[in-house]
Amino acid sequence: MTTSSPSQVRQNYHQDSEAAINRQINLELYASYVYLSMSYYFDRDDVALKNFAKYFLHQSHEEREHAEKLMKLQNQRGGRIFLQDIKKPDRDDWESGLNAMECALHLEKNVNQSLLELHKLATDKNDPHLCDFIETHYLDEQVKAIKQLGDHVTNLRKMGAPDSGMAEYLFDKHTLGDSDNES
């Protein structure tokens, strides 16, 4: 492995920020991996909730795009991308739509907390460009995703999930099916 040469474009980009961006890339890829696992769980013949599958596949793609955007930023700022192993999801069986939505809500809150810590680091290192990037491309979207998942969890519970299989079928058909994956 060759050592990377110093960047000629690097300016006001602290090494702690560079390292934090690499950690955030890993977290976004992990989130994408979790959502991919969820998607194909709901696509199984014995689960057969196609709109849950579509919803989580869309989320997986979004998280991968978030990682790619951070990788592009890393290169633009003169940082170096160091990829790490992506942890596998904590489970393979997501049990129910409600359980998966609760896990997704927890995941999005963890991603959001990491972004808030990255923003604080950028503030502490006096990096207005990184602050603006996080604010513009991530923070508002995270809040909206958390709200949407919270609403989904609430509605599934009100409908009687997970005790009622009919609740998840109707939610899949009428909420996720009608929304066409609105974010």
Swiss-Prot record:
GO terms for biological process: immune response; intracellular iron ion homeostasis; iron ion transport; negative regulation of cell population proliferation; negative regulation of ferroptosis. One of its GO terms (cellular component) is lysosome. Keywords: Acetylation, Cytoplasm, Cytoplasmic vesicle, Iron, Iron storage, Lysosome, Metal-binding, Oxidoreductase, Phosphoprotein. Ubiquitous. SUPFAM superfamilies: Ferritin-like. Disulfide bonds: none annotated. It is an enzyme of class 1 (oxidoreductase). It comes from the Eukaryota. Residues 11-160 form the Ferritin-like diiron domain. The modification N-acetylthreonine is found at T2. The keyword Transcription regulation does not apply. It catalyses: 4 Fe(2+) + O2 + 4 H(+) = 4 Fe(3+) + 2 H2O. PANTHER family: FERRITIN (PTHR11431), FERRITIN HEAVY CHAIN (PTHR11431:SF37). Oligomer of 24 subunits. There are two types of subunits: L (light) chain and H (heavy) chain. The major chain can be light or heavy, depending on the species and tissue type. The functional molecule forms a roughly spherical shell with a diameter of 12 nm and contains a central cavity into which the insoluble mineral iron core is deposited. Interacts with NCOA4; NCOA4 promotes targeting of the iron-binding ferritin complex to autolysosomes following starvation or iron depletion. This is Ferritin heavy chain. It comes from Trichosurus vulpecula (Brush-tailed possum).
